[in-house]
From Swiss-Prot:
InterPro entries: Chaperonin_Cpn60_CS, Cpn60/GroEL, Cpn60/GroEL/TCP-1, GroEL-like_apical_dom_sf, GROEL-like_equatorial_sf, TCP-1-like_intermed_sf. Belongs to the chaperonin (HSP60) family. HAMAP family: CH60 (MF_00600). Keywords: ATP-binding, Chaperone, Cytoplasm, Isomerase, Nucleotide-binding. Its main location: cytoplasm. One of its GO terms (biological process) is protein refolding. Gene3D superfamilies: GroEL, GroEL-like equatorial domain, TCP-1-like chaperonin intermediate domain. The keyword Chaperone applies. It is an enzyme of class 5 (isomerase). This is Chaperonin GroEL. It comes from the Bacteria. It is found in: Cytoplasm.
């Protein structure tokens, strides 16, 4: 297929047109008074959203060069959301403003490479000032404020997220699910839970709830399949002398071994239960080690030179309470050494930092949560499917932004933090580097201006008023008042502001230093020819019908 090449100003102007269209669609969602965007779906009802990244993801333009510009900024919005959970609209507004200012200067003859260098220096200096101005998230109230703002000022969602984080800690896993009704709910699972239930319902101790509960129990951990009773008989005899219940976690327990355990359980000889080990392959081995660390036990594995026949009671883990239903096993109050658990947590955190796979990262974070806190499930309720999807997206974003706030701290919100940081930056640059520096200094005013415009105020007037003051002074777009942003609880995670600015400068630099674009030429398909009508004999005789 033939391809068309566009050069210099012609290419950059078309790229800018794509960025402008994306920006115009996304910017309306910004701030507490942001508007909704209605998105047509390929099937079913259209979706309504105030989430910038959800709008950006839907945009495809007909002009191939303009579409390339839009797709690059869309990628920035997505990466900002992935890294910080919020700030997608901020990143888009910044990218557009930087590109617009930069394009004007480059068209007038500025050197793109020098301009880029000045932009990078300005952004780095502003980020350093943001870090200095940030403060650590103190308590539940500040977490509620961050979550509320990220959930588009929904205080109920903010409170749910704060409650969840309080219960499972900053390393705990918080998942978001759809509720069956219209009310929002929070469920918290204490201890370590994995998705394996009892191997036989005859292990049940509570017939009403259909659960097996073992108190002050031993835990046998092995990566072997147990099919013969003689494999575990010596260990069973030793635990019977101790008079404590036993949970067996193995690759599988089948045949004679399972039958014998069930019969002895029913006769009251053994207080026992058995479940399959969680996970598969290498992940199963790691999860067994996690349980061993949590309970102070040892995985009995032939790889380590250990066999079930020769296993001692010292190899068994211990837990205060174990609850098993048909789908899940929960281990509460594991008796492992706290130092061993901390070491294991640190090891998993290192693996999370080094892995590039999103799937592996998610599974590692689940393991981390099970070791360090627990799992909280926020169940989102809504009256319709459209409302449910929109609300669930907001909760996901608010959750990520709140974690970002806990991780790196908070700054004043409402677009004021960037302006305050810029007021403290004074770089002595020359020529086109100075042009790049000034581009950033003007562009960082755009988020505050857009928040004000969406709330029905004059963006320029609001920016000028905020610039006259120092400290935590900013603009509350919800009521149109100038306030102390920290006192009013209008705050943003530092990580969100930092990543939004870094990503915006990065993509704008790429676009401004683009000198050519290459795209396929769409071949217009010729319209199908009219079918040959033939003679259509007999038509001439129609005159007699007059």
């Amino acid at each position: 297929m033939a391809k068309e090449i566009k050069f210099s100003d012609s290419a950059r102007n078309l790229l800018f047109e794509g960025v402008r269209q994306l920006h115009d669609a996304v910017k309306v969602t910004m701030g507490p008074r942001g508007r909704n965007v209605l998105i047509q779906k390929s099937y079913g009802a259209p979706s309504i959203t105030k989430d910038g990244v959800s709008v950006a993801k839907e945009i495809e333009l007909s002009c191939p060069v303009a579409n390339m510009g839009a797709q690059l900024v869309k990628e920035v919005a997505s990466k900002t959301a992935d890294a910080a959970g919020d700030g997608t609209t901020t990143a888009t507004v910044l990218a557009y403003s930087i590109f617009k200012e930069g394009l004007r200067n480059i068209t007038a003859g500025a050197n793109p490479i020098e301009v880029k260098r000045g932009m990078d220096k300005a952004a780095e200096a502003i980020i350093n000032e943001l870090k200095k101005a940030s403060k650590k998230v103190g308590g539940k109230e500040e977490i509620t404020q961050v979550a509320t703002i990220s959930a588009n000022s929904d205080h109920n969602i903010g409170k749910l997220i704060a409650d969840a984080m309080e219960k499972v800690g900053k390393d705990g896993v918080i998942t978001v699910e759809e509720a069956k009704g219209i009310e929002d709910e929070l469920d918290v699972v204490e201890g370590m839970q994995f998705d394996r239930g009892y191997l036989s319902p005859y292990f049940v101790t509570n017939a009403e709830k259909m659960t097996a509960q073992l108190d002050n129990a031993y835990i046998l951990l092995t990566d072997k399949k147990i099919s013969s009773m003689k494999d575990i008989l010596p260990l069973l005899e030793k635990t019977m002398k101790e008079g404590k219940p036993l949970l067996i976690i193995a690759e599988d327990i089948e045949g004679e071994a399972l039958t014998t355990l069930v019969v002895n359980k029913l006769r009251g000889v053994l207080n026992i239960a058995a479940v399959k080990a969680p996970g598969f392959g290498d992940r199963r081995k790691e999860m067994l080690k996690d349980i061993a660390v949590l309970t102070g036990g040892q995985v009995i594995s032939e790889e380590l030179g250990l066999s079930l026949e020769n296993a001692e009671v010292e190899f068994l883990g211990k837990a205060g309470r174990i609850v098993i239903d048909k789908d899940n096993t929960t281990i509460v109050d594991g008796k492992g050494h706290s130092d061993d658990v901390k070491d294991r947590v640190a090891q998993i955190k290192t693996q999370i930092a080094s892995t590039t796979s999103d799937y592996d990262k998610e599974k590692l974070q689940e393991r981390l949560a099970k070791l360090s806190g627990g799992v909280a499930v926020i169940k989102v309720g809504a009256a319709s499917e459209v409302e449910m999807k929109e609300k669930k997206d907001r909760v996901d974003d608010a959750l990520s932004a709140t974690k970002a706030a806990v991780e790196e701290g908070i700054v004043i919100g409402g677009g004021a933090a960037l302006i305050r940081a810029a007021q403290k930056v004074h770089l002595n640059l020359h020529d086109d580097e100075k042009v790049g520096y000034e581009i950033i200094m003007r562009a960082i005013k755009a988020p505050l201006a857009q928040i004000a415009i969406n709330a029905g105020y004059d963006g320029g007037v609001v920016v000028n008023e905020v610039e006259k003051h120092e400290g935590h002074f900013g603009f509350n777009a919800s009521n149109g008042k100038y306030v102390d942003m920290f006192k009013e609880g209008i705050i943003d995670p530092l990580k969100v502001e930092r990543i939004a600015l870094q990503n915006a400068v990065s993509v704008s630099s790429l676009l401004l230093t683009t000198e050519a674009t290459v795209h396929e030429i769409k071949e217009e398909k010729a319209a199908p020819a009219m079918p040959d009508m033939g003679g259509m004999g007999g038509m001439g005789g129609m005159g007699g019908m007059m």
